[in-house]
A protein has these predicted regions:
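Catalytic Walker B motif of ABC-type/P-loop ATPase nucleotide-binding domains
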Residues: 99-102
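Conserved ABC ATPase signature
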Residues: 74-78, 82
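ABC ATPase NBD Q-loop/coupling interface
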Residues: 1-13
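Conserved catalytic motifs of ABC-family nucleotide-binding domains
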Residues: 95
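Short coil-to-helix segment of the ABC ATPase nucleotide-binding domain corresponding to the Q-loop/switch region
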Residues: 31-39
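Conserved ABC ATPase "signature" region
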Residues: 50-69
Length: 189
């Protein structure tokens, strides 16, 4: 990965390079917000003291627009948008080099989706990280992507800059982005 033979690294060395925002947030319901954010900071090669981990958690929560007053709350006490922000804070807690975003706006209303997309774009640029996003949300694609790859049946059907997406001339891309039932992607009726 990025010129490093992963077979010659430890599991911790490999994982410390990555952050992940899961589709459903994947927050631990038995852990407070700050402990969710600090999950990777409390184990492995990046282990920090409890106080330092909490301090970093609060800093990352602030970065995603949440105040320290939610640090001791539990995920069930938060709205869906707040949970997504906590998940984003956890994804950046270790200052990773690469972040994966799996359907980052799933379950959010259009306004919160826009807020999360803006946060993702800002954070990726600010941290200078590589980001890979898996999404079917074309609003997210247009808001956060630089390069786009269209996958269908396990194959890349098209790859190119976001600016060329609507003029790709690719029938798979066109069917998907315009949401038509006619085209090479089989639909059920």
């Amino acid at each position: 990965v990025d010129g490093v033979d992963v077979n010659e690294t430890t599991h911790d060395q490999f994982l410390e390079r990555f952050g992940m925002l899961f589709q459903g947030g994947a927050l631990f319901d038995s852990l407070s917000v700050w402990k969710n954010v600090a999950f990777r900071l409390q184990r492995g090669s990046q282990k920090r003291s409890k106080d330092e981990a909490r301090e970093i958690s609060i800093k990352k929560l602030r970065r995603v627009g949440l105040g320290p007053e939610i640090a001791d709350k539990y995920p069930a006490e938060l709205s869906g948008g707040m949970q997504k922000r906590v998940s984003l804070a956890r994804a950046i807690a270790t200052d990773p080099e690469i972040i994966f975003f799996d359907e980052p706006t799933t379950g959010l209303d259009p306004i919160m989706s826009s807020v999360i997309n803006e946060l993702i774009r800002e954070i990726v640029v600010e941290l200078g990280v590589t980001a890979m996003t898996i999404t079917h949300d074309m609003g997210s694609v247009m808001a956060i992507a630089d390069q786009v790859a269209m996958l269908h049946d396990g194959k890349i059907q098209w790859c190119g800059p976001r600016s060329k997406l609507k003029d790709s001339g690719n029938p798979y891309v066109n069917q998907f982005i315009y949401g038509t039932s006619k085209g090479p992607i089989k639909t059920l009726r």
